[in-house]
Amino acid sequence: NDNPILPFQLIEKIHSETNLTLADVIYWKKKNSMPFQSSRTNLSRIVEPVYVFVNKQNLKSFKTNKEISKINEKTNQKFYKHYTNYIEAKNNDSIKTKLKATYSSELVTKLINIYFTKGSLIYDPFSGIGTTAVGCKISDCNYIGSEIKEEFYLQSIDLIKKVDKIKDI
């Protein structure tokens, strides 16, 4: 198991060495904890952090897809529908794969619906089996992805074709 400090060290490096900064942390509660208990010291994780990065100059102004629930008539202040940083979604799309780090198109779709409007272009540098592409298709967003392992790339093409067939019905 990796040292739990590593993600925080990476976040600090991203902040200090790039034009990006951490804007939010969302916690994804999976339906099942993974990995299975094989460690004497570590607990099995049922919650995973999802880190949201933005350009530093956009930290207070980046756009989301949050709904306005009310506008104060006197001050024009906007109030938004209540969103929390805790999302429940299944672990994966029940696809048999050798890829160990999969997440579900359900999680992706929920994140897209918070942060992106229809027609947005989303890039996934580690496409894996294509769950981000599926979330984009479901949410009417455009998608570009990269995957270096041909096996996972081919699985992603099959998964995307299945979603296309469902959307055509």
Residue ranges and their predicted role:
Residues 1-154, 162:
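Core catalytic lobe of class I
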Residues 157-169:
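S-adenosyl-L-methionine
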